[in-house]
Amino acid sequence: MLLVIGLGNPGKEYQYTRHNVGFIAIEKIANQYNSSFSTKKKFNCEIAETISYGQKIIFIKPTTYMNLSGKSVISVKTYYNIYPAKSFVIHDDIDLETGRVKFKTGGGNGGHNGLKSIDGVIGNNYNRIRIGVGRPQNNQDLADYVLNHFSKPEYKTVMQAIDRITSNFGLILENKLEEFKNKMA
């Protein structure tokens, strides 16, 4: 069983912001596996489930806002008894240029509050699919930057990255993590 977590903030006003790139990606991946989200209040998230490559996949979008994402993750992880090593978090990363994707297992949170929240409840030995959103320019406040919408060219670049993640996601299901990592580089 795999747990796939897309990080973002609930609400239409955040839908296409840089901080919600995890939500955008997980919706596209779940859709590829003919799975749709429904709200599960007991887990504080939207959840979608499917079976592929002989294993159950649980997709979640926390509805707690970014800084409390761990609350949803620990609820689902505990209920389904999923190990952190079988968890994949998809999130925005300001330290990567827009549209760049990196895959890694474990490590620090890089100041990302959603990852801090998850680290606080399950540790940091989980997998991360980092989607670059770039850094703010001209002394723009970081919070304002990540909560702002993409420009049209940025959005196109990010969607191409998400398409690459989606088309190669089967490698994760086949436990070919190194091959997935190489495809993202």
Curated annotation (Swiss-Prot):
CDD domains: PTH. It is an enzyme of class 3 (hydrolase). Gene3D superfamilies: Peptidyl-tRNA hydrolase (3.40.50.1470). GO terms for molecular function: peptidyl-tRNA hydrolase activity; tRNA binding. The record marks D92 as: Stabilizes the basic form of H active site to accept a proton. PROSITE patterns: PEPT_TRNA_HYDROL_1, PEPT_TRNA_HYDROL_2. GO terms for biological process: protein quality control for misfolded or incompletely synthesized proteins; rescue of stalled ribosome. InterPro entries: Pept_tRNA_hydro, Pept_tRNA_hydro_CS, Pept_tRNA_hydro_sf. Keywords: Cytoplasm, Hydrolase, RNA-binding, tRNA-binding. One of its GO terms (cellular component) is cytoplasm. Its main location: cytoplasm. The record marks N9 as: Discriminates between blocked and unblocked aminoacyl-tRNA. Belongs to the PTH family. Hydrolyzes ribosome-free peptidyl-tRNAs (with 1 or more amino acids incorporated), which drop off the ribosome during protein synthesis, or as a result of ribosome stalling. This is Peptidyl-tRNA hydrolase. The gene is pth.
